[in-house]
């Protein structure tokens, strides 16, 4: 890896950071995170802080968890990757799907569909909902309702049902038939009701 000065000098020059305009990233360069342990992260200048968003996607068990590192390392030597697409699968996917299904057995889950993240999961759920109604002979059931301020990802469908304008308005028009309802938040009371139910 290049030295810290090179990293700082090239920060935001070639990488388009999510949720920001490239020119803004040049004026206010993103913090460069260089290491992490448990729930703490450290930047290129040595400042350490708690990662209160959990890496946003994938570190709910903390950074540098030894059991996870060992499992990943072992798997990289056996089979680093293979798709479960078009008639193939792999043993870790089968084992993981059984473990997830067993966790949700009392809810009636019978199958698991793995995705690479939350946005992919929302896209898949939207497509499955459409397919479900089409197969039941109700192809016109195409509307989606979600809560204002709710976050549902950044892909096309996810942004469409996203209740947070920041992730939606710059890309509209998006998927038609998406409606955003006020959250049932008694403190702010968007319904102007006195009944707490």
What are the language-model segments listed below?
Residues 1-37, 87, 92:
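Active-site-adjacent loop/helix segments that line or gate small-molecule/cofactor pockets in enzymes
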Residues 12-16, 20, 73-81, 101-105, ...:
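Generic secondary-structure signature for well-ordered alpha-helical cores
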Residues 15, 119-120, 151-155:
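Conserved A3 ("GATE") glycine/threonine-rich loop of ANL adenylate-forming enzymes
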Residues 30-51:
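Active-site and channel-lining beta-strand-loop segments
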Residues 32-35, 107, 164:
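Short solvent-exposed loop/turn micro-motifs enriched in small/polar/acidic residues
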Residues 38-40, 111, 143, 193:
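Conserved beta-strand and immediately adjacent loop positions that scaffold enzyme active sites
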Residues 48-138, 145:
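Glycine-rich loop-to-alpha-helix module at the N-terminal edge of alpha/beta enzyme cores
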Residues 148-197:
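PLP-dependent aminotransferase-class I/II
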């Amino acid at each position: 890896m290049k030295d810290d000065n090179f990293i700082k000098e090239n920060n935001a020059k070639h990488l388009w950071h999510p949720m920001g305009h490239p020119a803004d990233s040049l004026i206010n360069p993103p913090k460069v995170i260089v290491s992490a342990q448990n729930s703490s992260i450290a930047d290129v200048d040595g400042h350490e802080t708690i990662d209160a968003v959990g890496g946003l996607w994938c570190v709910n068990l903390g950074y540098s968890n030894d059991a996870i590192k060992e499992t990943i390392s072992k798997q990289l030597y056996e089979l680093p990757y293979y798709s479960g697409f078009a008639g193939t699968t792999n043993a870790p996917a089968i084992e993981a799907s059984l473990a997830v299904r067993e966790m949700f057995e009392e809810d009636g889950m019978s199958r698991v569909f793995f995705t690479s993240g939350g946005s992919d999961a929302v896209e898949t759920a939207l497509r499955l909902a459409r397919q479900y109604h089409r197969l039941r002979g109700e192809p016109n059931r195409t509307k989606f309702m979600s809560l204002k301020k709710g976050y549902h990802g950044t892909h096309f469908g996810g942004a469409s049902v996203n209740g947070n304008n920041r992730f939606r308005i710059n890309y509209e028009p998006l998927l038609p038939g998406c409606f955003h309802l006020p959250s049932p938040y008694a403190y702010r009371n968007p319904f102007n009701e006195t009944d707490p139910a």
